Amino acid sequence: MGIFDKIFGKKKQTSDVNIFDKLYPYQKEAVASAIANDKGIVCMPTGTGKTYIQSAIIADDIIKNGDFQIYVVNAPRIVLTYQLLKEVYGFLAEAKIEARYMFVHSGGKMNEKELEDIRIKANLDGANIPFSEIGSGTNIAEIREMIGKAKKQNLPLIFFSTYHSAERIEDARVGFKPISIVLNDEAHYLVQEQFHDILHTLKSNRCYFFTATTISTPSDTGRGMNNKESYGDVLYVMTPREAIDLGKMVRPRLHFVITDGVYNTDDYNNSLNKIIKDTFEQHERILTKTLPKVLVSAKGTQDIKNFLKSIECRQLMRDGVSIYAVASNGEIGNNINGEQVSREEFLRRLKTDGLDVTRKLIVLHYDILAEGIDVSGFSGIMPLRTLSKSKFLQTYGRSARPDAEDRRKVDNGEINVDDLELMNKPYAYIMIPSVYSGNDDDKANVVQLITELRDYGFNPNEDIVGTDRIHGISEEEQLESLNELKRNLPNIGETIENLQVVLEAEKHAKLSKSELLKNQFGI
């Protein structure tokens, strides 16, 4: 008997599909850690397959216990619940597991065509999953009715809820069996006061928290994820560097962009449209094997509205660039090339264009696409505002997904993760327009950014690109990029150089005497 047979135990129901065969070894470890504990945190970078882990946890419990069980998958945003349901549905269908599903939020139903395609394919592969309508609503009576139907059919029921609406499930559940498992996606949101109470109101036998970055508070009895009573222990951690070494993320590079005549905040406000266009075009020039697909984090919805009405936007569209914009603002909504579309249509076309190697994209958002949305193909991000640590890591994660062909070749052993010159997408770029005035806040923002990127193996001497540099340059030329930055943006360049000195000193301070001699003098 293998180790995972021991961990996952004897199954109540049998299937000719091993649900764990499709998981990577690190995902199996995370699932095993969750199964061995009733509560805890799984912390892994964006793009490493946390939803697969959630799906496997649910599938394992269904196979072991079968029959009528209640599961809840929570997320901070409505749009993310749609993506989560699709992935969980696909995983369970492939495992030949029939279940009932319901959304608990105000966003309405999703287009079920994609789910039908998944169901039909699973049935062609030997499953026997009948069509069933996906429920949706926040009315307690409707939720309770769905629970009753699942119980009568003796089928597992999986709710996909926003944090805002999750307590309605507990209200509707009264009189039925307890919730078996609660899975909280983007769980760092639960630190916020408006959501934290559901940790206590939504009762379950088992509860897990998934995030790319944990948030702690000064007190280990407060709302932070360092409160073990609320969140349990950290069950599994994968660092960004580990994800890169496994080929599940790409390396970051900073691209400081020089835009003529734009150097301070006032100029920024007057020249935003030019900044976006020039930055995009300079980014395109440094790419050698892929076309640019850039995610822009706007300062506010007004910036997005102004850009969509600008000459620069029209010029980019004439040049073949598709312009996507999304915000909760009704005037923006879900916008593709100036046309309002449904949320589902927006996400469907965005995913399709993200995979299309012949497409150029600019996607502007304000606080919408940062969390967990499955859009691949971004070549870089353009943060036009200072992001919190969690927001930055989530936003960068949107562009850090490897190219599909690169991932396949790494998985098959055709190339390794250090064969950067053989990859279509060896790096994800963080584009910094030259709107810094060199004041203390600007310097602090750059220092904070580089400090966060250290977890990704970022080296300021090697991973900064100037306007006329391309990826794949030699080490000597990489160093010249920092010198170029010092010439064009002296305040920022000197700040980075000084930070590098501090980082090197910190690194050396951690070395033993023998390690230091070897590192410094080769002896």
Task: List each model region and its residues.
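Conserved RecA-like P-loop NTPase helicase motor core
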Residues: 330-461
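Conserved helix/coil segment N-terminal to the catalytic DExD/H
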Residues: 140-178, 192-197, 368
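Walker A/P-loop
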Residues: 37-58
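Conserved Walker A/P-loop ATP-binding site and its immediately adjacent core
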Residues: 52-56, 61, 67-92, 96, ...
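Conserved interdomain linker/interface between the two RecA-like ATPase lobes of SF2 helicase motors
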Residues: 232-305, 310
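Conserved pre-motif I regulatory segment
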Residues: 8-43
